[in-house]
């Protein structure tokens, strides 16, 4: 039987300062010559993701750390030994009988916004250890209740971790397959029975395959948090919804300016093409397998982004987009056969991303309900 969760209305909750529960230790500087691309250990410093790898380590697994310089306030619980850089600090539980390690991690995660607010500085933000030690942390007195709460939240994290592994595997496989397909790797073509590509693969400009349309400006009051048709602008993700789409499904789009310039999207349902985007509708829908061109453009995406970002005022005009050369196969059947191999991997990748995003939202919502708000 699953134990009943103790919500934040429970009278057994109290609060203690971070310094009374943990021993804090600042990380160490890692010399550049100790960085190794194939090193045994990850090196975490001031970023959420690893800053590199090394063959040295200074922190054991199952250690909590907080970033105090850079992405200030981010709380991490390592599952492997690693090197903790000087822009992070480690937290060691002083009394394991008073606070469970996993519960401690989630208690700190529930206070990330407050931890982040401790950062000071003009250009480079930092958190002083003295300020961190005075931060109040929510604590439920019963160690068993702590473990019950930690278990409920860790179920989500285990699934999210598994999804992240699947995302990485599918991303690598998709990129590997795309490279082999569009470089006409002989072994790959033999394996998938795509020999005809040797004779049929050529190049064509986007303007010869697609009708390109610039995005349309839409007032804020015409966009909604929920709805049927997604709105896409200059960001990778949909930011809102609209009542009426201006572009049909089975279409592509390219981000025309801003930080994400050159990013390619495939839309399976009708959508609204907003400011900062270029929509691409097939000129001959019955003779164009759109996912094939999506996979081709995704394969080219990194080079396209680098090319456009080199410009003084990065912006992709309709003319420039229409002149982009992409791999082309005249046979619709061959487009479909080749494109599906890559597209199905990309689709699985996106499904894993969506599930992970949804679970993170549910977990964070539960985190807020389980832990009380401290004054």
Curated annotation (Swiss-Prot):
GO BP term, example: DNA restriction-modification system
Q: Which InterPro entries match?
A: Restrct_endonuc_typeI_TRD, Restrct_endonuc_typeI_TRD_sf, Type-I_RS_S_subunit
Which GO MF terms are attached to this record? DNA binding
Which CDD domains does the entry mention?
A: RMtype1_S_MgeORF438P-TRD-CR_like
Keyword annotations of the record: DNA-binding, Restriction system
Q: What induces it?
A: Highly expressed after 6 and 96 hours growth, there are fewer copies at 96 hours (at protein level).
Annotated domain remarks? Contains two DNA recognition domains, each specifying recognition of one of the two defined components of the target sequence.
PANTHER family per the UniProt record, alphabetical:
TYPE I RESTRICTION ENZYME HINDI SPECIFICITY SUBUNIT, TYPE-1 RESTRICTION ENZYME ECOKI SPECIFICITY PROTEIN
Family, similarity comment: Belongs to the type-I restriction system S methylase family.
Subunit record text: The methyltransferase is composed of M and S polypeptides.
Q: Per its database record, what is this protein's job?
A: The specificity (S) subunit of a type I methyltransferase (MTase); this subunit dictates DNA sequence specificity. The single R subunit has multiple frameshifts and is probably not expressed.
Spell out the protein name for this chain. Answer: Putative type I specificity subunit S.MpnORF638P
> Which species does the entry assign this protein to?
Mycoplasma pneumoniae (strain ATCC 29342 / M129 / Subtype 1) (Mycoplasmoides pneumoniae)
């Amino acid at each position: 039987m699953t134990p009943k969760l103790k919500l934040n209305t429970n009278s057994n909750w109290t609060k203690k300062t971070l310094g009374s529960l943990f021993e804090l230790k600042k990380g160490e500087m890692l010399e550049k010559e100790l960085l190794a691309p194939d090193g045994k250990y990850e090196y975490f410093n001031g970023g959420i993701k690893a800053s590199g790898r090394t063959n040295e380590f200074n922190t054991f697994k199952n250690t909590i750390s907080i970033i105090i310089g850079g992405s200030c306030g981010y709380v991490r619980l390592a599952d492997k030994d690693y090197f903790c850089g000087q822009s992070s600090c480690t937290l060691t539980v002083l009394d394991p009988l008073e606070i469970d390690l996993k519960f401690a991690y989630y208690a700190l995660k529930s206070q990330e916004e407050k931890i982040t607010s401790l950062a000071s500085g003009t250009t480079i933000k930092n958190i002083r250890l003295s300020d961190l030690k005075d931060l109040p942390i929510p604590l439920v007195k019963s160690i068993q209740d702590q473990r019950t709460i930690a278990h409920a939240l860790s179920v989500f994290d285990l699934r999210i971790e598994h999804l992240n592994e699947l995302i990485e595997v599918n991303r690598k496989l998709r990129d590997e397959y795309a490279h082999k397909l569009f470089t006409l790797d002989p072994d790959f073509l033999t394996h998938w029975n795509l020999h005809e590509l040797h004779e049929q693969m050529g190049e064509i400009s986007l303007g010869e395959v697609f009708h390109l349309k610039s995005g349309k400006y839409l007032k804020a009051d015409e966009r909604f948090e929920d709805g049927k048709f997604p709105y896409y602008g200059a960001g990778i993700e949909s930011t809102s919804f609209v009542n009426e789409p201006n572009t049909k499904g089975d279409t592509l789009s390219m981000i025309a300016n801003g930080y994400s310039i050159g990013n390619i999207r495939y839309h399976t349902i009708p959508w609204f093409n907003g400011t900062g985007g270029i929509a691409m509708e097939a000129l001959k829908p019955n003779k164009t397998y759109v996912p094939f061109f999506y996979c081709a453009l995704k394969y080219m995406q990194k080079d396209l982004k680098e090319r456009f970002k080199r410009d003084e005022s990065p912006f992709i005009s309709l003319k420039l987009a229409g002149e982009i050369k992409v791999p082309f196969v005249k046979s619709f059947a061959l487009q479909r056969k080749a494109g599906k191999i890559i597209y199905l991997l990309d689709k699985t990748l996106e499904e894993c991303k969506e599930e992970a995003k949804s679970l993170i939202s549910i977990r964070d919502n539960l985190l807020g309900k389980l832990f009380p708000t401290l004054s």
